[in-house]
From Swiss-Prot:
Disulfide bonds: none annotated. Overexpression increases levels of unsaturated fatty acids and suppresses both the temperature-sensitive fabA6 mutation and cold-sensitive secG null mutation. GO terms for cellular component: cytosol. Belongs to the gns family. GO terms for biological process: unsaturated fatty acid biosynthetic process. It comes from Escherichia coli (strain K12). It comes from the Bacteria. This is Protein GnsB.
Amino acid sequence: MNIENLKTKAEADISEYITKKIIELKKKTGKEVTSIQFTAREKMTGLESYDVKINLI
């Protein structure tokens, strides 16, 4: 696979995972997800990961 294909696959996988978690939260809490905020956690060598904040109503 080339880099573009790998990137596209990773984006689709992440999107699918987030969708599953939104559905799971709605079922367990009965509330809607209003927003998801991603804050990058970086090191001197680049992006390490993200902190995630989910808001429900």
